[in-house]
From Swiss-Prot:
Membrane topology: Lipid-anchor
The organism of origin for this protein: Homo sapiens
Catalytic reaction(s) noted: L-seryl-[protein] + ATP = O-phospho-L-seryl-[protein] + ADP + H(+); L-threonyl-[protein] + ATP = O-phospho-L-threonyl-[protein] + ADP + H(+)
Record flagged with keyword Nucleotide-binding: yes
Cell compartment(s), UniProt: Cell membrane
Protein kinase domain span: 23-281
Any Gene Ontology biological process: intracellular signal transduction
Name of the featured protein: Serine/threonine-protein kinase 32A
Enzyme class, broadest EC rank: transferase
Cofactor: Mg(2+)
InterPro entries: Kinase-like_dom_sf (IPR011009), Prot_kinase_dom (IPR000719), Protein_kinase_ATP_BS (IPR017441), Ser/Thr_kinase_AS (IPR008271)
Keyword flag Kinase: yes
Mutagenesis or variant effect for M316I: In a lung neuroendocrine carcinoma sample; somatic mutation
Active site (catalytic residues): D146
Amino acid sequence: MGANTSRKPPVFDENEDVNFDHFEILRAIGKGSFGKVCIVQKNDTKKMYAMKYMNKQKCVERNEVRNVFKELQIMQGLEHPFLVNLWYSFQDEEDMFMVVDLLLGGDLRYHLQQNVHFKEETVKLFICELVMALDYLQNQRIIHRDMKPDNILLDEHGHVHITDFNIAAMLPRETQITTMAGTKPYMAPEMFSSRKGAGYSFAVDWWSLGVTAYELLRGRRPYHIRSSTSSKEIVHTFETTVVTYPSAWSQEMVSLLKKLLEPNPDQRFSQLSDVQNFPYMNDINWDAVFQKRLIPGFIPNKGRLNCDPTFELEEMILESKPLHKKKKRLAKKEKDMRKCDSSQTCLLQEHLDSVQKEFIIFNREKVNRDFNKRQPNLALEQTKDPQGEDGQNNNL
């Protein structure tokens, strides 16, 4: 037991479900809609991720469990260069966990608050990257419904990634949505008349993109709308406000923003082809955009943490249930919950048991590994396909 003794690295079974013990907690970096976010490192691969954790009891008490489950269901089916992708989801008795891409460039709201002045060419590339993400979501029948600077993260190179699918909706074909959801200053006009039966579709995300792009360029939004503004006032604002565009902006950018901020969803730009065919985008190599080969005009400062540093204090000092004390707390909780001391406690435990049973466990690493294993077999089957022979020399 001397200095020559070294700790053996933990052994991981690739078929085992990922759990909390597979990660090292490094630091807290932010708050999500229903939980908090910290930086973690996976012990076997040493890869860094962001881990969002949501307290089950709080989710039950706030009736938010279904939203979490829906977000998990949606994110498991998505993978794109300009999204924040889900890698793992798991649970313990206390929390639900989502492990996603780690993006340390901060969200666009943070940079706006730091008085960053985004140049037109920078915003132009942001728009290109975001419309590719929106096109992908549209093909997957997903409406995000909360596009705004707060939900757009930058990676260390300055590329944008859409996050937070908590109020996203899956849209069956030939249907529209009538429920109102979103952040009012970024919600499209048709969303405020949806209760009258008209409904809305994918075009609402493109309106939100227009509001966001305008705000990035000017530092304020095109319409004076707050979260506290009533729906009636918002409708009146849309009907009476004439959006102004600074003369310093190029006419091409102004024309594009007008297409995104078109009140009529049938005339609004809401397809990737709309933007790609727009004259302002003639100089864009879209393959290079997708492959992140175009250099953004704004690159986050690598020498600073691009988030509010108070999150670390809240987690480690002020938070009544800090994550780094989880193991000790769970052991005590298991002992305390062996008996129900009231009907209310028993009812809560029933709900928590239901969450435990219905939670969706996910491991993208395993999904990708299984997919790659199937590929050689698929290729072999195709070479044996007699229908593939056309009697011609197909070698090029």
